[in-house]
Design a protein with these regions (language model features):
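N-terminal targeting sequences that direct proteins away from the cytosol to non-cytosolic compartments
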Residues: 1-78, 148-152, 159-182
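Conserved polar/disulfide-associated segments of primarily extracytoplasmic proteins
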Residues: 67-155, 160, 164
Length: 182
């Protein structure tokens, strides 16, 4: 039966986002996800370094590097940080009246009093010393820690450019706390 008062529904064009715009949005989303994963990995991924007589946690992209420090056991670096490890044996420091069981603070004092250094000490506590150093036109922030074991004291220096201090100062402490002497 014909019903003149009923109007047929009007069909509109397809609703939704046009295909070209959707393609662009998917590409942007994929790029942001990939960038986010890379950023997260670079800033959080770690690995266990196998050093000479110790292990420690460090950034996943850090590699062994060379050094001019004659006393260095190991040197590691990436594009933003450096880690240097030195061991002072008990016999090395016995000549200066120090021995087994000294506090980290006493060993830091020994090093600072007897070493030739261009470091500007900015702080010291029972576990770490903090310093700045300028080499040429670059300014660096550093932190040193000491771990006793295996016949001596292992000194670890963690270094980055001063501009990256806030990014790394807590990470340096985490890495130092992860040291295990073998």
């Amino acid at each position: 039966a014909y019903e003149p008062y009923k109007i047929a529904p009007v069909t509109s064009a397809k609703k939704g986002i046009p295909k070209p715009l959707m393609s662009v949005l998917v590409f942007i989303l994929a790029f942001l996800v990939a960038f986010g994963v890379r950023y997260f990995y670079k800033n959080t991924a770690t690995k266990t370094l196998q050093g000479t007589g110790y292990t420690m946690t460090a950034p996943a992209d850090i590699e062994k590097s060379s050094s001019t420090n004659l006393y260095a056991l190991d040197n590691f670096s990436n594009n933003e940080v450096g880690i240097n490890a030195v061991k002072l044996s008990y016999s090395d420091i016995a000549l200066y009246g120090y021995g087994k069981g000294e506090s980290a603070s006493d060993i830091f004092d020994f090093i600072l009093e007897n070493g030739s250094t261009t470091l500007k000490i900015t702080g010291k506590d029972s576990k770490y010393i903090y310093y700045t150093q300028s080499i040429g036109d670059k300014h660096y922030y550093g932190m040193s820690s000491i771990t006793e074991g295996n016949g001596g004291y292992y000194i670890f220096d963690f270094l980055c450019e001063q501009k990256n201090k806030s990014k790394y100062e807590d990470k340096f402490k985490d890495w130092a706390a992860s040291v295990e002497i073998k």
